[in-house]
Amino acid sequence: GFNIVRRNLFYESRGGLVCRHGHNNIIDSNVIIGNHLPATLGIRIINQGHTVSNNYVESVTGKGSGAAFILRMGVYERPNTSEDYEDEKLKSYHRAADIDIAFNTFVDCTELNFGDGRGDKEPRNVRFAHNRIYSPNTVPNIKISNPTIFPGITFINNFCQFKNNESPNIKGFQITTFNIEQIKAQRHQAVSPMDCGTSWHNVELSEMKTLTELMN
């Protein structure tokens, strides 16, 4: 836990940015571009104490647990004692709780999913606020897979644009008309290739050229 994942580029990735093993992570200002390729993934939220903010997700095609965004149902409570840890599988999903998801942008994605996955531990104290969802050529892509997520999640002042100005009919989402150029300007927020990646990997010139081309 306590990881910071900030200002990275995920391009045509079939692997997601997943908060699974650990708590209190910061997922901030990342760019995820799926280019409409099959089974591309976005951000999957499980466990507790995360902040997910200012991320840009575009043309991701996955659904359910592989959607552009997913808040997953939990299988276990967060362990508190040594006995809890011994009884729990390492790959388990803890209840999602105490999470802020705010100021993110989703463009032309197939689905944003709330409540998918096996398990009966619904989220608690989760806020999805001030996010932008732009999919003008499709019907509303916000899917509530499990209604027991309420009242554990609150949607606050989110803005969306769908085909024919159709509404998702979920409290906390407002229909609007976006300036697409302003929306897509956020895809350039990833840092320069020289500043990307792990501290132990030196970026080669060929990698710099490729990453720069992807962002233009």
Each language-model region and where it sits:
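Active-site and glycan-interaction determinants of carbohydrate-active enzymes
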Residues: Q186-N216
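Glycine- and acidic/polar-rich repeat regions and solenoidal domains
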Residues: G1-D195
